[in-house]
């Protein structure tokens, strides 16, 4: 199965040109961060001893004085980048994504020291159901350039493919979407997020720079639901941001009130969903957007109206990045 996906990357390369998707060696595809700081990045492996040594991968994005270079989007090993990209594209039913994800780069200084800006506010980000953490790289890098530490989290077993430092790739199982499955995944995700919160002061490179009294949780889709669920119950969390998500799923306890500053940014179907009627916060509706307009897919596959609607990637980025920064500046800056 994996071999077939890898081979498909070569087969779709010509199609990307025909459809107008940019193809280039080391192409960035992602927008340049808009803040004044360069961006650092470090991958982190966390082990939860309370859950049979469950291993969780995360990436910390942060401001640095080191000039950013063009770095691989997924993996430093090209073959593993191709494998992971092919798997993610297969899960999203968009084979053209395999090419752009595998070729993409991000402007980041890997492992560089944190800029001496004092203690920095923190955002922990949970991706959508069956979506890898790297599809939030554009947003994470932009917030980092504005002075935030952003930790994106992969939920092992649910994420399509997660690479660990030893080169091992943990392939996930496609979601079942049954009530029982959704309840199990919410529990696993919430515990993953709390693990990151517990370990913030110990994280490599950024641990001594984070301000654990200024924390926001954010997420896309089911990741937004995860953020709201944890944020509502954990006193360490000061704010919650939900990108195109709702607050109820079959099988999972609904979030009926959010006792924190909250942002909902999404398509009309999300912003008018009944689960948000009792929640007071900032609501930003983006007509014409698609569910994945709030992720890097908006840049990596702009021709997909199924995933990204009719709003351009540049427009989706501008709205998402600016509204997130405005909300976070008011909530935890």
Report residues per predicted region.
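Alpha/beta-hydrolase active-site loop
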Residues: 157-159, 163-212
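The feature captures the conserved acid-bearing segment of alpha/beta-hydrolase catalytic domains
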Residues: 115-117, 238-294
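Secretory targeting and sorting signals
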Residues: 1-24
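Domain-level recognition of soluble alpha/beta enzyme cores
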Residues: 24-123, 310, 324
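Active-site machinery of serine-nucleophile hydrolases
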Residues: 63-65, 74-92, 134-175, 287, ...
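C-terminal catalytic-base region of ester-bond hydrolases, centering on the histidine
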Residues: 276-333
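Short substrate-entry loop that stabilizes the transition state in hydrolases
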Residues: 104-120, 125-163, 270-272
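Primarily recognizes the serine-hydrolase "nucleophile elbow" in alpha/beta-hydrolase
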Residues: 196-255
């Amino acid at each position: 199965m994996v071999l077939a996906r890898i081979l498909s990357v070569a087969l779709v390369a010509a199609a990307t040109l025909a459809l107008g998707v940019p193809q280039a060696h080391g192409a960035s595809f992602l927008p340049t961060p808009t803040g004044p700081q360069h961006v650092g990045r470090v991958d982190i492996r966390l082990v939860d001893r309370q859950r049979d040594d469950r291993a969780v991968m995360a990436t910390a994005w942060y401001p640095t004085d080191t000039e950013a270079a063009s770095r691989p989007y997924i993996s430093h090993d090209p073959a593993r980048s191709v494998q992971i990209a092919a798997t993610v594209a297969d899960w999203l039913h968009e084979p053209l994504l395999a090419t752009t994800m595998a070729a993409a780069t991000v402007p980041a200084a890997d492992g560089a020291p944190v800029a001496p800006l004092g203690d920095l506010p923190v955002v922990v980000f949970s991706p959508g159901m069956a979506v890898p953490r790297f599809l939030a790289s554009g947003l994470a890098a932009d917030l980092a350039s504005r002075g935030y530490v952003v930790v994106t989290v992969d939920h092992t077993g649910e994420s399509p493919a997660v690479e660990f430092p030893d080169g091992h790739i943990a392939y996930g199982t496609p979601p079942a979407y049954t009530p029982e499955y959704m309840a199990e995944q919410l529990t696993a995700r919430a515990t993953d997020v709390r693990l990151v919160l517990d370990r913030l002061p110990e994280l490599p490179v950024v641990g001594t720079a984070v301000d654990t009294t200024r924390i926001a949780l954010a997420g896309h889709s089911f990741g937004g639901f995860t953020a709201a669920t944890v944020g509502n119950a954990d006193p360490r969390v000061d704010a919650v941001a939900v990108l195109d998500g709702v607050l109820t799923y079959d099988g999972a306890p609904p979030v009926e009130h959010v006792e924190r500053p909250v942002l909902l940014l999404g398509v009309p179907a999300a912003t008018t969903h009944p689960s948000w009627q009792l929640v007071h916060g900032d609501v930003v509706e983006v007509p014409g957007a698609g569910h994945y307009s709030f992720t890097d897919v908006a840049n990596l596959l702009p021709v997909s109206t199924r995933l990204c609607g009719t709003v351009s990637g540049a427009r989706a980025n501008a709205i998402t990045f600016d509204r997130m920064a405005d909300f976070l500046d008011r909530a935890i800056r």
